[in-house]
A protein has these predicted regions:
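Compositionally biased linear targeting/interaction segments
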Residues: 1-62
Length: 62
């Protein structure tokens, strides 16, 4: 999934993202621009290391 292009509904539909994580992604893009790496998501308490490890195989930052 292209994390910088997916809308809220598509993000929420991903089995490894919950509603709060999806909202953080949308808000980050709105206020700070594109997400360039998982390390940016790691700055948010809603993203535990296990969450990021699971997501890494399924998302891209294009």
């Amino acid at each position: 999934m292209e994390i910088n292009k997916a809308g809220l509904d598509k993000l929420r539909a991903h089995p490894y993202l919950n509603f709060f994580q999806a909202k953080i992604i949308i808000e980050h893009r709105r206020t700070k621009g594109a997400i360039k790496s998982l390390s940016q998501l790691a700055l948010y308490e809603e993203f535990a290391e296990k969450d990021l490890n699971r997501l890494s195989a399924y998302i891209s930052f294009d």
